[in-house]
Every structure is written in structure tokens, then in C-alpha cells.
Amino acid sequence: MKDRYILAFETSCDETSVAVLKNDDELLSNVIASQIESHKRFGGVVPEVASRHHVEVITACIEEALAEAGITEEDVTAVAVTYGPGLVGALLVGLSAAKAFAWAHGLPLIPVNHMAGHLMAAQSVEPLEFPLLALLVSGGHTELVYVSEAGDYKIVGETRDDAVGEAYDKVGRVMGLTYPAGREIDELAHQGQDIYDFPRAMIKEDNLEFSFSGLKSAFINLHHNAEQKGESLSTEDLCASFQAAVLDILMAKTKKALEKYPVKTLVVAGGVAANKGLRERLAAEITDVKVIIPPLRLCGDNAGMIAYASVSEWNKENFAGWDLNAKPSLAFDTME
């Protein structure tokens, strides 16, 4: 059987990425051009800046991905692309490049949900067994997803307000940490003590919903009040207390979901899945099901994960037309 090569594109936010996947599971290349340095001074992603950067580097990323994979344009079998959720301008750059490549070479175009990409990045660790449950944690999303089979995703719980990664970045900004703040808060948390009593919203409620706005507000109020009084607070202890509250919420809801949906596998994915504290809690507390977390290089936004997610769509021949458009608010269906 002839080898299949999928060329995948990811430009939903501030990473321009192009990857090549051979057959179902051999990631030959995963080129990522990060824009973090451009957005640091703004304390967050500026959509217009992100779009312009994507335009500047997308062609070079395609060339590098093909070269690193050791294939030519003529070897590509199909093109996969993120079409949502994300920043509309950023998404359109990847969509335009993917459609142009597919059209020029007469190839099928595979539409991929960005969050499905995060989830299916776990396929790089080992073949996934369905049904499974996934905890998706990133800068824009916090959700529990039930996956009955590859490509069939249903939300069973999600945040009512801030995403967990968003909360990390906002409290990081208050402390004067560098954007994105997640890694630094995690590192500082391991040097401090959980001495500040922050709220754990909805932790005892009988649902699978998350809420981080109250925790974020409590943190900001404590920090500002201390500043106004001229008091000095330990940054390490603040980070340790904040992260302890976040992880308590995530763990409580995940355990509740595992009780409700008896599965053998839990996938934890998204940018926040790189968090050392979260990985430690999962290893210590989730012992009755298999926990699969993508490698660090596949936790953040990257086209490799989009390639993995595209395989199930390829198998179903779920191809898009040339009218495929960006869907910035694209979401999985909710479990009824």
C-alpha cells in the first residue's frame, strides 16, 4: 500500500505551524514559528499582530516542514487545516495557505477542530482505546469531553467563565510575570507554600462545570490590597496557593466525570497539560484508569496535533469544499 502523507496547518492563535504525518502515526516534521516575543510587551496576544506574523512566515514553514520530512510537494496525499476555534484573522491565514496548496495539487482538504487536535495529540503516545474521557485545558478552553470513537466528541462539562490558562495569564500579569505566565507560575509554585486561602468555586456542586473568575478576582484583590497597604507578599507562596486552588478544582471535576462516565482512559491535553503540578496530581490521584498526556512538544499549539486529528476525518472521507471558512467560535457538541 502506498504511504499517505498529510500536510497539516495550524494558525489559530500565535503559533504558525506546519507538519507532515506519514500514515496514521509517524510524525515526520512539526515546524513551529512562535510569536511569543512579539506579544510579550502587550501582556497577551494582539490579533492583528498575530495575523501579520502568520502571513510573513507561513510559506517558509511549509518549505521547512516538507524538507524536514524528506518529501516533495508531489508526495503529499491530503491537506489538513484548523478552521476553528481561534482568532478569525489568524485562522484565515492558515486556511488560505492550506486551500491554495490543496487546490494547486488537486488534493482533498480535511477540516479539523483545534480542540480535537489537542485531544488527538495523545495518539502520539500510544493508540487510543475508546470510549475515553478527556480533560482539555488551555488558554481559551477548559472542558471535559467524552469521546465514544475517534472523531465523535461530546462536551460533558466546561468553564462558565475564564479558561484555566487565561486565569494563569491574568494573575501572572498582576504579579509582573512574563507572558505567557503559566510555566513561571508553575515553577514558582514549587518553591512556595499554600498559605493563602483562595476560593475553589463549584468544587462541591454535583455537576461537571468549572469556574475560575472568582479565584482570579480573589487573587487580584489580595495582591492589590497588599500593595495599597505597603505590605510585601511572597510571590512563591502566592503562586503555590493559586495553583493549589486551580488543581483542586480540576482534579475534583475530573474525578467526578470519571465516576459518571466509566472509561479506561483519561486524556489530559492542551497547553496547561504541560503544567508540572497538574501532572504530579494526576499521577498521584488518578490510579484506576490509564492517564495519557501528550509530550511537552505537542501540548502547545502545533500542526502535528492537527495531523493526528485529521486521520479519523480522512478515514470517514470527511473532506471540505473550497468554501470552507474560519469558525472562531467552533465548539464540540454538548452531551445531551
Swiss-Prot record:
* SUPFAM superfamilies the record matches: Actin-like ATPase domain
Top-level taxon of origin: Bacteria
Q: Could you say which residues bind substrate here?
A: L136, V137, S138, G139, G140, D169, G182, D186, N275
Cofactor, free-text remark: Binds 1 Fe(2+) ion per subunit.
Q: Does the keyword Acyltransferase apply?
A: yes
MF terms from GO for this chain are: iron ion binding; N(6)-L-threonylcarbamoyladenine synthase activity
Function statement: Required for the formation of a threonylcarbamoyl group on adenosine at position 37 (t(6)A37) in tRNAs that read codons beginning with adenine. Is involved in the transfer of the threonylcarbamoyl moiety of threonylcarbamoyl-AMP (TC-AMP) to the N6 group of A37, together with TsaE and TsaB. TsaD likely plays a direct catalytic role in this reaction.
UniProt family annotation: Belongs to the KAE1 / TsaD family.
Q: Where in the cell is it found?
A: Cytoplasm
Q: What class of enzyme is it?
A: transferase
UniProt xrefs under CDD domains? ASKHA_NBD_TsaD_bac
UniProt protein name? tRNA N6-adenosine threonylcarbamoyltransferase
Q: What's the cofactor?
A: Fe(2+)
Keyword Iron among UniProt keywords: yes
List ligand-binding residues for Fe cation. H114, H118, D301
Q: Which Pfam families match?
A: TsaD
Q: What is the lineage of its organism?
A: Bacteria, Bacillati, Bacillota, Bacilli, Lactobacillales
Fetch the InterPro entries from UniProt: ATPase_NBD, Gcp-like_dom, KAE1/TsaD, Peptidase_M22_CS, TsaD
Enzyme Commission code(s) on record = 2.3.1.234
The GO cellular component terms are: cytoplasm
Q: Name the catalysed reactions.
A: L-threonylcarbamoyladenylate + adenosine(37) in tRNA = N(6)-L-threonylcarbamoyladenosine(37) in tRNA + AMP + H(+)
Alphabetically list the UniProt keywords: Acyltransferase, Cytoplasm, Iron, Metal-binding, Transferase, tRNA processing
NCBIfam families membership: gcp_kae1, T6A_TsaD_YgjD
This protein's gene is called tsaD
